[in-house]
């Protein structure tokens, strides 16, 4: 029998056994409670990185632990396989995206299997599989029928490098989230999902997710951005219509002196007088190519242009010039802002720059503001002035009063708006899910009939690197008869945003072999919601919000019962090295393959779990990896060295244990308690592993000559191996087998700690006099209060502080301290 730890041999052996025996396959016919565990599935980029190793190791510990705790654990894996990198690789390498993607999947699957992850590989899916995206097309058609999918012309975020549209959430600091190119504004016909219809439910249900990090919930609430206010109509001079604004500050309406429109506002050009047209067009073009995030930044220079038109303040009847302003966006409110320069800093800076009127309508109590001497806008609450019948009223009270007045006079309506905008899903790329729509000159927009699904992504596509989608140049794909009238028609050539696929994959895992509909309601309702979801904080708004939206839509379409997809969410930290996130450009990447080849998967897993709590960044260091490997070698040697001792051990006689044996057993059961609590309640894997390391030290120095040394050591080593099983499953399985234990560890129950054994015989207690530490005493565990008081009062170190004073009170906190109050 191999005595030296050989991770390669051990890991290969057990990976083969797990695969052959389908050890982690599950179904719904179980009397165990279900537990659905999921890590965010990866994009098949070619190979896994250390972030994957950490993420999937975290999930695997939870899955193996829950399995040993008696749960029916669903732990699937798949591939978020559509997307631009495959298409770009096709252009660069002259390889079809499908070939590139599936080769990467095969390679990465092998890498994940080498990590010993407990996935039910029978449920594996790839979003580029026809059997997956066909059902997504059906869901699209059902959303279209319900008015949840629609097409409109709008300004969109355009990445000139990727040559495709980006959702607002995919623009980071004015750049494309994938390639970092500056994003431009472009007007296109686009397909949208009506996520705004679910804005209030998405917001209110954040209160029903106590298992989510507060940071993520705050980010989602802010992105949804609910605001209470008024929509107010400002009539155009000359009686030719009006400009509608949304404001959360109706109390400032008497101070509105000009109007600011977003350059993209639909009325911008029609309000421009002929003499202003050239200047306005130049301004619109300039702003269109400006980073949107810069436009709203506090330190960005406020610029604008006068349109030549005026509107009328409905309360003051003052004539207000209408400007286009670079800091106003169309995707908040109505895209028009009533400018109140004395009470809004951006308006103040703009008015000062262009010489526009300032009028104070809110004063701080006891102070008079003079517009001529103001150096900044006054934005705090105060007392109303220059506001007609509302003068003297508090500004907070005036918000409601003026809103009511506007509504009564027909000049405005109290309303609620959201920052959230509908989700633009059109992408001008090939490697994605075709949008199942046909355009007919006679019939208009015609959904592809369900009997004609799926719309297959054609394989005979040429990748030239030219702009736009290759599908738009493929006549055999484009030209089709209209399903309604039979006349020549054209297919939609846009594909869906890849975030659509990741918005429901967790549901399809529940029934990947179901061929009659997108989802099998019975099986989905058994498994959903996901009990524990694991992924990066960078998905807080994008993927997680879309997944919540899709779950609610599918609930309303009758496919699922649940309203929220993920009960608990863990956002793990990054893996960093030399103070920076690992990346090829920084030259600080650690190759998991090389790591596993040298040390084994168990060592890689152990270090990634031990070096930091899951939610914190992990700072990579080679010494830590060496330390983890040495620890596993010590475990291996200890168990193998003690096999003979424990093999012939008599059953454990607890009442007959010696004091030394009892101490050793106490260490074992305290460790079981500690590791159980750390994994189950807090996912503090680092402190759980540290506790096992401490136990190993105790076991290595244990006296083997005591009467029941073999029996105590047998229980201790069995517990040690079981506690390590979720972290280092290959070694644990091998040692378990060598110890002569029947069955696999995956079906072996987690050890239960003996409450009596885990309690210390003696405890160290602090003794204070008037709150100051004066001594420490060792007492028998479970001593009653009177005994503790007597021991404290009699202690030699305490006695000098009791001379010549009266003991007024003795406060006892069992197991911790005794405080003697004197005076």
UniProtKB/Swiss-Prot annotation:
Catalytic activity: tRNA(Leu) + L-leucine + ATP = L-leucyl-tRNA(Leu) + AMP + diphosphate
Keywords tagged on the record: Aminoacyl-tRNA synthetase, ATP-binding, Cytoplasm, Ligase, Nucleotide-binding, Protein biosynthesis
EC number: 6.1.1.4
Primary localization: cytoplasm
InterPro entries per UniProt: aa-tRNA-synth_I_CS (IPR001412), aa-tRNA-synth_Ia (IPR002300), Leu-tRNA-ligase (IPR002302), Leu_tRNA-synth_edit (IPR025709), M/V/L/I-tRNA-synth_anticd-bd (IPR013155), Methionyl/Leucyl_tRNA_Synth (IPR015413), Rossmann-like_a/b/a_fold (IPR014729), tRNAsynth_Ia_anticodon-bd (IPR009080)
GO molecular function: aminoacyl-tRNA deacylase activity; ATP binding; leucine-tRNA ligase activity
PROSITE patterns: AA_TRNA_LIGASE_I
Motif 'HIGH' region: chain residues: 42-52
Name of the protein in its database record: Leucine--tRNA ligase
Gene: leuS
């Amino acid at each position: 029998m191999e005595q030296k730890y050989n991770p390669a041999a051990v890991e290969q052996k057990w990976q083969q056994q797990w695969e052959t025996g389908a050890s982690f396959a599950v179904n719904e016919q179980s009397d165990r409670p279900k537990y659905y565990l999921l890590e965010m599935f990866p994009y098949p980029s070619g190979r896994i990185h250390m972030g994957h190793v950490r993420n999937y190791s975290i999930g695997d510990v939870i899955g193996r632990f829950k399995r040993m705790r008696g749960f029916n654990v669903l732990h699937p894996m798949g591939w978020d396989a559509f997307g631009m990198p495959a298409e770009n690789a096709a252009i660069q390498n002259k390889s079809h995206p499908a070939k590139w993607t599936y080769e990467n999947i095969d390679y990465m699957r092998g890498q994940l299997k080498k990590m010993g992850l407990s996935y039910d590989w029978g449920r594996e899916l790839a979003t580029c599989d026809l059997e997956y995206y066909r059902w997504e097309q059906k869901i699209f058609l059902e959303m279209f029928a319900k008015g949840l999918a629609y097409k409109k012309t709008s300004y969109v975020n355009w990445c000139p490098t990727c040559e495709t549209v980006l959702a607002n959430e995919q623009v980071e600091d004015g750049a494309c989230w994938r390639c970092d190119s500056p994003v431009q504004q472009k007007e296109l016909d686009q397909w949208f999902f009506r996520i705004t219809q679910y804005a209030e439910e998405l917001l209110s249900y954040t209160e029903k997710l106590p298992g989510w990090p507060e940071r993520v919930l705050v980010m989602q609430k802010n992105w949804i951005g609910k605001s209470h206010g008024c929509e107010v109509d400002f009539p155009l001079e000359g009686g030719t219509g009006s400009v509608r604004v949304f404001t959360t500050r109706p109390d400032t309406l008497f101070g509105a002196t000009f109007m600011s429109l977003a350059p993209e506002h639909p009325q911008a050009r029609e309000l421009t007088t002929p003499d202003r047209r050239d200047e306005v067009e130049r301004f619109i073009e300039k702003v269109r190519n400006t980073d949107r995030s810069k436009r709203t930044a506090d330190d960005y220079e406020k610029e604008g242009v006068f349109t030549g038109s005026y509107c009328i303040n409905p309360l003051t009847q003052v004539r207000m010039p209408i400007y286009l302003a670079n800091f106003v966006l169309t995707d908040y409110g109505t895209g028009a802002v009533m400018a109140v320069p004395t009470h809004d800093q951006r308006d103040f800076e703009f008015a000062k720059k262009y010489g526009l009127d300032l009028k104070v309508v809110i004063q701080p109590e006891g102070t008079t503001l003079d517009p001529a001497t103001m150096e900044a806008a006054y934005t705090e609450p105060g007392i109303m002035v220059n506001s007609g019948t509302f003068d003297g009223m508090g500004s907070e009270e005036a918000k409601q009063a003026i809103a009511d007045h506007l509504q009564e006079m027909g000049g405005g309506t109290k309303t609620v708006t959201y920052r959230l905008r509908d989700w633009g899903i059109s992408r001008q790329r090939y490697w994605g899910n075709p949008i199942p729509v046909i355009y007919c000159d006679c019939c208009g927009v015609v959904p592809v009939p369900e009997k004609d699904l799926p719309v297959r992504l054609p394989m005979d596509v040429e990748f030239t690197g030219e702009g736009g989608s290759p599908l738009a140049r493929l006549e055999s794909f484009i030209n089709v008869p209209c399903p309604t009238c039979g006349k020549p028609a054209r297919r939609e050539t846009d594909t869906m945003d890849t975030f659509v696929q990741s918005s429901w994959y967790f549901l399809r895992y529940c029934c990947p072999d179901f061929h009659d509909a997108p989802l099998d309601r019975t099986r989905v309702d058994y498994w959903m919601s996901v009990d524990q979801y694991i992924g990066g904080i960078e998905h807080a708004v994008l993927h997680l919000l879309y997944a919540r939206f899709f779950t609610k839509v599918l609930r309303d379409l009758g496919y699922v019962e649940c309203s929220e997809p993920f009960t608990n969410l863990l956002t793990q930290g990054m893996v960093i090295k030399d103070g920076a996130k690992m990346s090829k450009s920084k030259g600080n990447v650690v190759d998991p393959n090389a790591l596993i080849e040298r040390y084994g998967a168990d060592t890689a897993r152990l270090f990634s779990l031990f070096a930091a709590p899951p939610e914190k960044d992990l700072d990579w260091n080679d010494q830590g990896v060496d330390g983890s490997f040495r620890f596993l070698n010590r475990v291996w040697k200890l168990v193998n060295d003690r096999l003979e001792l424990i093999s012939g051990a008599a059953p454990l006689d607890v009442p007959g244990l010696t004091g030394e044996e009892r101490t050793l057993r106490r260490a074992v059961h305290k460790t079981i308690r500690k590791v159980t609590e750390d994994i189950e309640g807090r996912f503090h894997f680092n402190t759980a592993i540290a506790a096992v390391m401490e136990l190993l030290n105790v076991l290595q120095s244990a006296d083997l000559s005591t009467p029941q040394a073999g029996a105590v050591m047998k229980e201790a080593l069995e517990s040690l191996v079981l506690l390590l099983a979720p972290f280092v499953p290959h070694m644990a399985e091998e040692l378990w087998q060598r110890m002569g234990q029947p069955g696999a560890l995956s079906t072996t129950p987690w050890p239960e700690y003996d409450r009596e054994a885990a309690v210390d015989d003696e405890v160290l207690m602090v003794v204070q006099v008037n709150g100051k530490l004066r001594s420490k005493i060792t007492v028998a565990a479970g001593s009653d209060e009177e005994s503790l008081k007597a021991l404290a009062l009699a202690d030699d170190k305490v006695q000098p502080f009791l001379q010549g004073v009266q003991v007024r009170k003795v406060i006892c906190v069992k197991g911790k301290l005794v405080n003697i109050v004197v005076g």
